[in-house]
């Protein structure tokens, strides 16, 4: 078992005036899109803001963030008529992941008798060079009901010249509280003594059979595989290699419990944007299954992340095989020494992120600047 090093507890940052935020999210990857939008909305509310979250599919919130929701945070269906809009527009409108806000909302913004809201396009997370160049750039609307208005690009990222990532103000305190009961969590999930707990949250990686074969034949690791529900569970259950491992199939859980799983495990294989950030904050060895794109544009995005991470050769090779950039047979053999090297790498990256102003603080300051 690897030690778990909690983040340092921090004090609350500067409180901004209370604003009303309208966040729009069209779901593509149900867990990642919903996860990022919910964490953003919830942390804005935690810092004194009021948020309306507009979604075309909020079904995942039933288990990811079950009610009661925090006071000041409300969830709404995708509006298609003016009657579904609030009587008073909010102060800030956020298009998450480049989604287009509804035409009725654009019309309402254009016809607003008062100053229009700050309009922000919250983009996908990336470590690629263009993020620093495009962060905070304006984009003037040239046609349609909102012609003449300006929206602003806000790019999450990994460097001080970007919008950074979501980090809750109480994250360090939560991790320190969990550290005292981490052994109990592991025991309750079938992880004994010095077992190597491996969490699996993925799509359908071609190298999954190779990973399972490794874990079966790795007595030095004493692996215990914890499999998240959905596509990861279906992929594992379809493979005969999994049977000797006796995987534990987890149930859907709220976000705080997902975080605790990452903190409890010794290796986290995660997918998408939200769980990548959570795995970095966990500070444990991690492997990212990036969302695949048909033109393989995700290959450059993955390599840019690995460059920022300063990934050692074994971690880079594992990512390449796990993401189909190289043959599944090239998947490096996991060893305790390798995991310790990966842990040091992730913790160094986490330390770098922790020195930056977090995404919520930055987007609040940006909105105040543009109002």
What would you call each of these model-derived segments?
Residues 23-34, 201-206, 267:
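Short, glycine-rich nucleotide/cofactor-binding loops
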Residues 311-371:
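C-terminal amphipathic helix plus adjacent low-complexity
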Residues 221-251:
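Catalytic donor nucleotide-activated moiety binding site of glycosyltransferases and closely related
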Residues 79-80, 249-259:
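Conserved active-site histidine-acidic residue motif and adjacent donor-binding/catalytic loop
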Residues 285-327:
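Nucleotide-sugar donor-binding patch of glycosyltransferase catalytic domains
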Residues 24-148, 230:
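Active-site and donor-binding regions of nucleotide-sugar-utilizing enzymes
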Residues 31, 38-41, 254-301:
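A donor-sugar binding/catalytic signature common to diverse glycosyltransferases
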Residues 123-208:
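A nucleotide-sugar donor-handling region in carbohydrate enzymes
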